[in-house]
Amino acid sequence: MSSIEERVNKIIVEQLGVKPEDVKSEASFVEDLGADSLDTVELVMALEEEFETEIPDEEAEKISTVQSAVDYIKAHS
């Protein structure tokens, strides 16, 4: 697991209050990890802060799984 994946997973655990073992690459924030729309906004904000990047709203809407978050950060940081 890369340091980006580890950092993304840590943020997801902190923001959503889930167990680390529940954070799998294919896990959906809403369906699998129980996030609501506010949780996902806060999660994107935490990712922006951690990786010092800006995620436009239209891109943020596409980030719905753990892997999609990792892929976005890898491509834009």
Swiss-Prot record:
The modification O-(pantetheine 4'-phosphoryl)serine is found at S37. Residues 2-77 form the Carrier domain. It comes from the Bacteria. Keywords: Cytoplasm, Fatty acid biosynthesis, Fatty acid metabolism, Lipid biosynthesis, Lipid metabolism, Phosphopantetheine, Phosphoprotein. 4'-phosphopantetheine is transferred from CoA to a specific serine of apo-ACP by AcpS. This modification is essential for activity because fatty acids are bound in thioester linkage to the sulfhydryl of the prosthetic group. GO terms for molecular function: acyl binding; acyl carrier activity. It is found in: Cytoplasm. One of its GO terms (biological process) is lipid A biosynthetic process. Its main location: cytoplasm. One of its GO terms (cellular component) is cytosol. Pathway: Lipid metabolism; fatty acid biosynthesis. PANTHER family: ACYL CARRIER PROTEIN, CARRIER DOMAIN-CONTAINING PROTEIN. Belongs to the acyl carrier protein (ACP) family. Carrier of the growing fatty acid chain in fatty acid biosynthesis. This is Acyl carrier protein. The gene is acpP.
